[in-house]
Amino acid sequence: MDAYSLSPTDSTTYSSDTFSTEFHTDAIAPPGNTPGNYTLDYNECFFNFCECCPPEKGPMGPMGERGLPGPPGERGPLGLPGEKGETGLRGPPGPAGLPGANGLNGDIGEKGDQGPVGLPGVPGIPGKPGEKGDPGLKGDKGERGFSGLKGDPGERGEPGLNGTKGSIGREGPMGPGLAGTKGLKGEQGLKGECLQGEKGERGPPGLRGEMGLNGTDGVKGERGEPGPLGGKGDTGARGPPGPPGGRGMAGLRGEKGLKGVRGPRGPKGPPGESVEQIRSAFSVGLFPSRSFPPPSLPVKFDKVFYNGEGHWDPTLNKFNVTYPGVYLFSYHITVRNRPVRAALVVNGVRKLRTRDSLYGQDIDQASNLALLHLTDGDQVWLETLRDWNGXYSSSEDDSTFSGFLLYPDTKKPTAMENL
């Protein structure tokens, strides 16, 4: 009881839901405004009937005696599930109880200690084979395996057909001709002689004259005319050798010489570099549940016979070309109840087509094979056309699709490498 409760001497009684839980002021609402039965003594007319005059809160009274236990309350609603508590310590084993009903599957507990080996149980009834699971995701590419041992040499093949005549080769460069010999110095020409005029006859001696005075120098005479050309002289001595002459024109190609004697065997060369063997192949089949595949879509080959390199994609039902080169593809289709038209498709282009017109319960086989040159990134698959989708498979008959790399492309030598 609180400060607002009635005194112990009051004879007023109320039901459990007398007072309302909503208040307009701090005062307690009058009992007449609440539902339920109650009794009011006339001496208690001082009780607050009006919200305008709320009573003041008095001091807290002494704690009363403990009342009798009330009747059990109604069961409340189911509470929210609590959080999972931590695993407690393992208690001592209790006595074996009676087998209870099977409870709900609980969370997986921690792995316990290994118990003692039990007695062999009664063999159970063999279960039914489970349904086939969905194909798993494509695994990561495995690491490179070790190089295999060198195989035995194969048998010698039959001689090939005569090849076509090759085109005429280009004109070769000028050959290293011999340099011409140094020419001899030409002979020196003869010295020409000038003819001398004939000497005149001597005149008679004159009288001796007296010594005359020294005369002045006379005027210098004019140069005389050149004499006539002399005759050819004798051959002179041999002169020194002249300068080397220019390079002569290349001579004609000589005849092929005789084959020389075989030389001695050369030393053993260093070991060559190891070449990684490139492989790419697949072989898949059709499960009976995939018979009569939908047309114009890649046929879903689920039965994998070989896919060692992982180049066949089972999710897309396509072969992914990883190495450029020449590939061989073949397919063998069992036909039943309806005709079939199949096509080998490369990047959306139908390269090879096959048809087999069959009706009724007869069974037939349609097959084909082709060599294709493909590049890195190409995709190859098999599909049926329109409503001619009689591809069939059973426990006795298979429809297969296979392919492998026949030989990869090789690097072509450049002009500099040829030199």
From Swiss-Prot:
Stretches for region Disordered: 63-275
Keyword Membrane among record annotations: no
Region (Nonhelical region (NC1)): 275-419
Superkingdom: Eukaryota
Nonhelical region (NC2): annotated span: 20-57
Coiled-coil spans in chain: none
Expression (tissue specificity): Specialized secretory supporting cells at the outer perimeter of the saccular epithelium.
Record keyword Signal present: yes
Glycosylation sites recorded in the entry for this protein: 37, 320
Main location: secreted
Keywords for the protein's UniProt record, in alphabetical order: Collagen, Extracellular matrix, Glycoprotein, Repeat, Secreted, Signal
Domain C1q as annotated: residue spans: 275-412
Gene3D superfamilies linked to this entry: 2.60.120.40
Gene Ontology CC: collagen trimer; extracellular region
Gly residues biased stretches: 227-236
Functional description taken from the UniProt entry: Forms a microstructural matrix within the otolithic membrane.
Protein name per its UniProtKB record: Inner ear-specific collagen
Organism: Lepomis macrochirus (Bluegill)
